[in-house]
Amino acid sequence: QRQMCIRDSYILPLSHDEVVHGKKSLIGRMPGEYADKFSQTRLLLMYQMAHPGKKLTFMGTELAQFIEWNFRQSLDWLLLDYPTHEAMQQFVRELNHFYTRTPVLYQLDDSWDGFEWISVDDRAHSVLAFLRKDAEGNKILCLFNFTPVEHYPYRVRLPFMATLDQAISNVDLREIKDVETVQLEDGYYADIMLSPYEAVYYYVNETEPGQQLQ
């Protein structure tokens, strides 16, 4: 997938073809209880937004519309009368705004310099972590918990000493969970609390090894 996004100016589509002809809507395909469906949809959207490649998401996803798209009728705007659906729309709005004002997430989409895996093979926890980077050296750490299980602490090994300032999470936009790395004998680590089905981005502020963190 990374080869395609670098070589072919890759697009990451969640298009109309995915929500018609008996496939169900995006949120309708999510397993679990009612609340879990919303959490997993937000998780998917944050995973899509963090990946290299340009994004395409079909209308209705931001409303968490349960019925399939039907060209004979309008979207179910009445869903916005319900708090969970209104919150989904607000989340998608904030995620889109965050993307447009954060060059780290798109400036080097067509370069190997814009992406670095941090955790790619943690099958035991089903957690992925990677860095996105821009040309000025700014970095964002992106983590994704694809399970209904809380992980705390979830230990991430980083290639540098840093403080991690939470940028956005799909769990609660008001809950801030900043993190500091620690230096152990074999490298630098951050212990992060991951809620069930959480996706979270952190601004990375690198510090010198051994420097006292404030």
Language-model features: locations:
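Short, small-residue-biased leader/transition segments that mark boundaries at the very start
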Residues: 2-6
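Carbohydrate-interacting/catalytic domains
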Residues: 8, 17, 22-26, 32-38, ...
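Conserved oxyanion/phosphate-binding beta-strand-loop segments in alpha/beta enzyme cores
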Residues: 13
